[in-house]
Design a protein with these regions (language model features):
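Glycine-rich phosphate/pyrophosphate-handling loop used in enzymes and phosphotransfer proteins
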Residues: 1-177
């Protein structure tokens, strides 16, 4: 790190998005402790895993996984809120790279031709400044070399926020979008 980076860090220190501890050199977005405590699912190692079963019959699917366990008020929620609502687009790239780095040794990405991020309505994209799904896809692509096709799917209907909806309500909210 250069002297300029040290000076920058002095005036603009970086903090962990989970525990708010000041980040050390070499840490990005998450401190090492929070990074190691992130609840990984291990689904990518399971044939016909819970994520795949949840999506069966809804659309044609090769494979699916969830990288982290999400629960209300857990650390993953804090990370996703920082990504979606606090303007931390680089966090999405970081998470995509982390996911790809951890899943790639298992062969999970073999046979995958493209990464297609979930589209965001233009109104939400303007408000947020970016599509968090595109940021994750960019991070995945950076490690795997798999190309990202951002414009393969288009969202033409605006939907209200789903943060206070149950699973069924969420599913119904995005029908025909």
């Amino acid at each position: 790190m250069s002297i300029w980076n040290d000076i920058w860090e002095l005036f603009f220190p970086r903090y962990c998005v989970v525990c708010s501890r000041r980040l050390l050199r070499g840490e990005a977005h998450l401190c090492l402790s929070c990074l190691n405590k992130m609840p990984r699912t291990g689904m990518h190692l399971q044939v016909d895993n819970a994520m795949e079963k949840n999506l069966w019959g809804k659309f044609t699917l090769g494979k699916a996984t969830a990288f982290l366990h999400y629960a209300k008020d857990n650390d993953v929620q804090k990370i996703l809120y920082a990504l979606k609502y606090y303007g931390d687009s680089d966090l999405g790239i970081f998470l995509g790279r982390l996911m790809a780095t951890e899943l790639q040794p298992s062969g999970f990405f073999q046979g995958i031709d493209y990464i297609v991020p979930v589209p965001l309505h233009e109104r939400k994209k303007r408000k947020r400044g970016y599509n968090q799904s595109e940021m994750l896809a960019s991070g995945l692509a950076g490690v795997t070399g798999i190309p990202v096709f951002k414009h393969l799917i288009v969202r033409d209907q605006y939907t209200e926020t789903q943060t206070r909806k149950g699973r069924f309500e969420r599913w119904m909210n995005v029908q025909d979008v």
